[in-house]
Amino acid sequence: RVTEGGKRLRFRACVIVGNKKGKVGVGVAKSGDVALAVDKAFLQAKKNLVDVGFSSYTIPCEVVSKFKAAKILLKPATEGTNIVAGGPVRSLLELAGIQNVVAKLLGSTKNKITNVYATMNALKKLKEYEDLRNEKFAKKVKEIKEEKK
């Protein structure tokens, strides 16, 4: 921004944190100094941790997710394929601990931050799917046990 005294710079930092065992978070922050922006983003990313929690080497099913103009497709892959994705999406999936997955950006945006948020939404959708599937499986097991009695 330009003021009477001259240009006033602001820096925006996007930080991804993860333990490679199913927890990942994203933080975005602005500041007048790069180091301060990174520190703020790191704290925000720690607050926004999401438990992905997949026990297998890949994701359970194909998922499409959208955030603003960014749209992403995540597909499960066979063991040994590794992560087929580019840029920040690859970093996010690595830090989440997903070993074999294919990702394709379908949206028309080149904005890395919106692409990362679209990927986070996709991982949240998968977590909801997993929870729903486990709930249905538990109901079926309960019904089978009741039939045997």
Task: Tell where the protein language model's regions lie, with residue ranges.
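Ribosome-associated RNA-binding proteins
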Residues: 1-149
